[in-house]
Regions:
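Ser/Thr/Pro-rich low-complexity tracts
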Residues: 29-140, 176, 251, 344
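Short loop/turn segments immediately following beta-strands, especially the blade-tip
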Residues: 244-250, 336-344, 452-454
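Blade-level signature of beta-propeller repeat domains, shared across WD40, Kelch, NHL, RCC1
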Residues: 426-454
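Conserved beta-propeller blade signature
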Residues: 176-179, 225-229, 277-281, 322-325, ...
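Gly/Pro-rich loop segments of beta-rich domains
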Residues: 67, 134-167, 183-184, 199-215, ...
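Residue-level detector of Asp-centered blade-edge/turn motifs that repeat once per structural unit
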Residues: 171-174, 219-223, 271-275, 316-320, ...
């Protein structure tokens, strides 16, 4: 008979499987979990506590997790439970049983119990891991896969709207999606569009004013302004404005010049998450600039001396002390420290991938390989999610630089919905996180995808 082992800081006990099953039968009795409000009490400080078993051994978000042992007390203020170091909500306790809820995105890991006795917590750790089961799916949100808008874009319901080349994408706190449908020139080739409540709407077309070559889109800190880099090209763009802005009070249909630098080739704008400062790249110089107000700007750093035309994408981490610089055409990601108090950057260092080396490989730091990584976003845990454009997939990079596959089949293009590791993308260009889903501008498929990985 197979035994189940659970360890605590003070004890290590071996329980036959029959005892586990008997315990579970006992747990099923409703009366066992009933606690009179008047009998709430902490674990007894002068008695030893035990954490014997937990059940079930696997599950997803919302799974009812039961811990059994001795001297837990009944006051949940003295009890803390974690799954893979993520806090689980403790619902109730009856001194021998704790009832908790598995948190979202816990991943596989040990169950830990903390009991407060006096001023300190006693810690108990399970011998076996709880196996987390993710709920995952990739679906098409809007656009008609494989069908591009040839001339004028078609607005309308999600299932009927036609996109040309969804290029950059962002969501506001209400879940409304704003995206740039790529195009250059003055004759409606590019556009700023909006998707909400099941409908796609075009807000601004390319014109003979300042909005001629939209190449990105990002919100101001309070989400009342959209900043749009205007990419200069010698043939069909006749304005020197390299950053355009549009305001919510005008329903984002107005476009005005924010910064004018001739032939800058700006690809990206980043907004500092604490100060609201606006930063942008100068592709012709391989540099990052800061907007200082009233159309003024200052040069902050050069990513790699003597090198330019990287087609940068910029994004701060959640605390604003690190700027990620995606060198798309050089197949790598840099990071650089930023001091918001002094408005100064450190020295850029290679974070993931290797400069000028394309390919596909998971791994840590410079051991990973990309093929045109593009516009990223952060997930709720602060990981970098990034479309690996010419590898036709989405990658995940932890703050420590560990690179793994997030969704898609590496180096296999196409359009397939379903499980993340079975789904196919075609040159995904940009991502943004909204609620519990990753929104993907699937450029080559002329549509926007929804990736739910709990």
């Amino acid at each position: 008979m197979k035994n189940l082992k659970i360890k605590s800081r003070k004890t290590r006990l071996v329980f036959p499987l029959c005892v586990v099953l008997l315990s579970l039968l006992t747990i099923c009795c409703n009366d066992e979990l009933k606690v009179d409000k008047e009998t709430f009490f902490p674990p007894k400080a002068d008695e030893e506590s035990r954490f014997d078993i937990f059940y079930p051994d696997s599950g997803g978000f919302g799974t009812k997790l039961i811990l059994k042992g001795y001297n837990f007390g009944t006051d949940t203020n003295y009890i803390k439970v974690t799954v893979n170091d993520k806090k689980a909500k403790v619902i109730r306790a009856n001194d021998n049983i704790i009832y908790a809820i598995v948190p979202s995105r816990a991943d596989t890991g040990y169950v830990r119990l903390y009991l407060k006795k006096g001023e300190e917590f006693e810690e108990f750790t399970s011998e076996t891991e709880f196996r987390y089961l993710f709920k995952s799916n990739v679906s098409t949100l809007f656009g008609v896969p494989g069908k591009a808008a040839e001339d004028n874009r078609l607005d309308g319901p999600y299932a009927e709207a036609l996109l040309r080349r969804p290029w950059q994408i962002v969501t506001d706190n209400d879940g409304t999606i704003y995206f740039v449908d790529e195009g250059r020139g003055q004759s409606k080739n590019g556009a700023l569009r909006k998707a909400s409540n099941g409908n796609v709407e075009t807000l601004v077309y390319d014109n003979n004013g300042v909005f001629q070559s939209p190449n990105g889109v990002v919100f101001s800190l309070n989400e009342d302004t959209l900043f749009i880099p205007n990419r200069w090209t010698g043939s069909d763009v006749k304005t020197d404005v390299n950053i355009v802005f549009s305001t919510r009070d005008a329903n984002f249909v107005n476009t005005k010049a924010l910064v004018t630098i001739p032939k800058a080739g700006t690809n990206s704008v980043a907004v500092h998450p604490k100060t609201g400062e606006v930063f942008f790249d100068h592709n012709s110089e391989g540099a990052v600039y800061r907007h200082t107000g009233n159309g003024n700007y200052e040069k902050m750093l050069v990513v790699r001396e003597g090198y330019n035309d990287m087609e940068m994408r910029l994004l701060f981490n959640k605390t604003g002390d690190i700027l990620y610089i995606i060198a798309r055409k050089k197949h790598c990601i840099y990071k650089v420290a930023y001091n918001a108090a002094t408005h100064t950057f450190g020295i850029p260092e290679l974070f993931a991938g290797d400069y000028g080396e394309s390919g596909y490989a998971s791994g840590k730091g410079t051991g990973a390989r990309f093929n045109q990584p593009s516009t990223p976003c952060l997930d709720p845990e602060g990981n970098l999610l990034i479309p690996d454009k010419m590898n036709h997939c989405i990658r995940k990079i932890t703050p420590e630089g560990e690179v793994t596959l997030y969704a898609g089949q590496p180096q296999k293009s196409g359009h397939t919905d379903g499980l993340p590791d079975k789904a196919k993308f075609y040159e995904p260009e940009a991502v943004t996180f909204s609620g519990n889903a990753l929104i993907v501008a699937d450029r080559g498929n002329h549509c926007v995808r929804n990736v739910v990985i709990e």
